[in-house]
Amino acid sequence: MKDEFGREIRSFRLSITPECNLKCFYCHREGRTEENGKLMSPDEIGKIVSASLEFGVRKIKISGGEPLVRKDLPKIIQNIKNDQIKDISLTTNGILLEKCAEDLKKAGLNRVNVSLDTLNPKKYKEITGGDVEKVKRGIEKAIFLGLTPLKVNFLAMDITLNDLSEVMDYCKKVGAILQIIEFIPVDPNLKHHHIDITPIEEEIAKKSEKVVTRKFMQNRKKYILDGLEIEFVRPMDNTEFCGHCTRIRLTYDGFLKPCLLRDDNLVDVVTPLRNEESIRSYFIKCIKNREPFCKAE
């Protein structure tokens, strides 16, 4: 199904918990500003995903909070798994990944994205409160088990820019894809950390041996530089990002969310599900609510 702007729905991002085992100062909390809802059960999540298939969803991304803090995550993945789903991936901070990777692989997870803004232990602890060595071990365990292609999410900010070269070298060494992500300063007090990543992309484009445009990923370009795959994610003021968005979202407490950058047009889908109603009409409402946050002039 297409929305009123001609955009197909292909991807469904599931936030399964607001809880996290780190305290990153920049966290946008998947666009949610409240934490007062009840978590969905694995069965409820499975039913909602199953209902989404009719509307074109073929890829699932699991996020949080930190999804690995849910001990029933393997069960959630098992309930999501379906012959029509082509890809189940997960975004994690990586702290618990070494411990959980094998069970997630067995449950049916295909691949992971891991946040890594610096390899400097002191700076990592200052930014997140965590231990970067645990993250590295998790990344390497996941790659060993075949949870690939593994992507490293590097958040480009004023305080992490000097770490980019080292993170690039690490990704090349372990065989990870690098995603350089523009920082979204949801809190106005953090705006000074935002940097324009256009010059970084232009410099990498000049040096790259190959450039591929990904049609179903907001026309995002993939650069090949010395064997390393590099992608850029620029959601701010980006008409390409919004104009080609194929994703809807589900909040941890059961609301369909048409847009990452909006919190005023959510559609409650878990209440009718719990009342044993059909939830088809709620997906239709969500898709009709979709519009590009950034529109071309």
Curated annotation (Swiss-Prot):
<feature type="binding site">
    <location>
        <position position="24"/>
    </location>
    <ligand>
        <name>[4Fe-4S] cluster 1</name>
    </ligand>
</feature>
<dbReference type="Pfam" id="PF13353">
    <property type="entry name" value="Fer4_12"/>
</dbReference>
<dbReference type="InterPro" id="IPR010505">
    <property type="entry name" value="MoaA_twitch"/>
</dbReference>
<keyword id="KW-0547">Nucleotide-binding</keyword>
<feature type="binding site">
    <location>
        <position position="61"/>
    </location>
    <ligand>
        <name>GTP</name>
    </ligand>
</feature>
<feature type="binding site">
    <location>
        <position position="115"/>
    </location>
    <ligand>
        <name>S-adenosyl-L-methionine</name>
    </ligand>
</feature>
<keyword id="KW-0456">Lyase</keyword>
<dbReference type="Pfam" id="PF04055">
    <property type="entry name" value="Radical_SAM"/>
</dbReference>
<keyword id="KW-0004">4Fe-4S</keyword>
<dbReference type="GO" id="GO:1904047">
    <property type="term" value="F:S-adenosyl-L-methionine binding"/>
</dbReference>
<comment type="pathway">
    <text>Cofactor biosynthesis; molybdopterin biosynthesis.</text>
</comment>
<feature type="domain" description="Radical SAM core">
    <location>
        <begin position="4"/>
        <end position="220"/>
    </location>
</feature>
<keyword id="KW-0408">Iron</keyword>
<keyword id="KW-0501">Molybdenum cofactor biosynthesis</keyword>
<feature type="binding site">
    <location>
        <position position="151"/>
    </location>
    <ligand>
        <name>GTP</name>
    </ligand>
</feature>
<feature type="binding site">
    <location>
        <position position="242"/>
    </location>
    <ligand>
        <name>[4Fe-4S] cluster 2</name>
    </ligand>
</feature>
<protein>
    <recommendedName>
        <fullName>Probable GTP 3',8-cyclase</fullName>
        <ecNumber>4.1.99.22</ecNumber>
    </recommendedName>
</protein>
<keyword id="KW-0342">GTP-binding</keyword>
<dbReference type="InterPro" id="IPR007197">
    <property type="entry name" value="rSAM"/>
</dbReference>
<keyword id="KW-0479">Metal-binding</keyword>
<dbReference type="InterPro" id="IPR013485">
    <property type="entry name" value="MoaA_arc"/>
</dbReference>
<keyword id="KW-0949">S-adenosyl-L-methionine</keyword>
<dbReference type="InterPro" id="IPR050105">
    <property type="entry name" value="MoCo_biosynth_MoaA/MoaC"/>
</dbReference>
<feature type="binding site">
    <location>
        <position position="65"/>
    </location>
    <ligand>
        <name>S-adenosyl-L-methionine</name>
    </ligand>
</feature>
<feature type="binding site">
    <location>
        <position position="259"/>
    </location>
    <ligand>
        <name>[4Fe-4S] cluster 2</name>
    </ligand>
</feature>
<dbReference type="Pfam" id="PF06463">
    <property type="entry name" value="Mob_synth_C"/>
</dbReference>
<dbReference type="GO" id="GO:0051539">
    <property type="term" value="F:4 iron, 4 sulfur cluster binding"/>
</dbReference>
<feature type="binding site">
    <location>
        <position position="27"/>
    </location>
    <ligand>
        <name>[4Fe-4S] cluster 1</name>
    </ligand>
</feature>
<feature type="binding site">
    <location>
        <position position="20"/>
    </location>
    <ligand>
        <name>[4Fe-4S] cluster 1</name>
    </ligand>
</feature>
<dbReference type="InterPro" id="IPR006638">
    <property type="entry name" value="Elp3/MiaA/NifB-like_rSAM"/>
</dbReference>
<dbReference type="GO" id="GO:0061798">
    <property type="term" value="F:GTP 3',8'-cyclase activity"/>
</dbReference>
<feature type="binding site">
    <location>
        <begin position="247"/>
        <end position="249"/>
    </location>
    <ligand>
        <name>GTP</name>
    </ligand>
</feature>
<dbReference type="GO" id="GO:0046872">
    <property type="term" value="F:metal ion binding"/>
</dbReference>
<feature type="binding site">
    <location>
        <position position="91"/>
    </location>
    <ligand>
        <name>GTP</name>
    </ligand>
</feature>
<comment type="function">
    <text>Catalyzes the cyclization of GTP to (8S)-3',8-cyclo-7,8-dihydroguanosine 5'-triphosphate.</text>
</comment>
<dbReference type="GO" id="GO:0006777">
    <property type="term" value="P:Mo-molybdopterin cofactor biosynthetic process"/>
</dbReference>
<dbReference type="GO" id="GO:0061799">
    <property type="term" value="F:cyclic pyranopterin monophosphate synthase activity"/>
</dbReference>
<feature type="binding site">
    <location>
        <position position="13"/>
    </location>
    <ligand>
        <name>GTP</name>
    </ligand>
</feature>
<comment type="similarity">
    <text>Belongs to the radical SAM superfamily. MoaA family.</text>
</comment>
<keyword id="KW-0411">Iron-sulfur</keyword>
<feature type="binding site">
    <location>
        <position position="245"/>
    </location>
    <ligand>
        <name>[4Fe-4S] cluster 2</name>
    </ligand>
</feature>
<dbReference type="InterPro" id="IPR013785">
    <property type="entry name" value="Aldolase_TIM"/>
</dbReference>
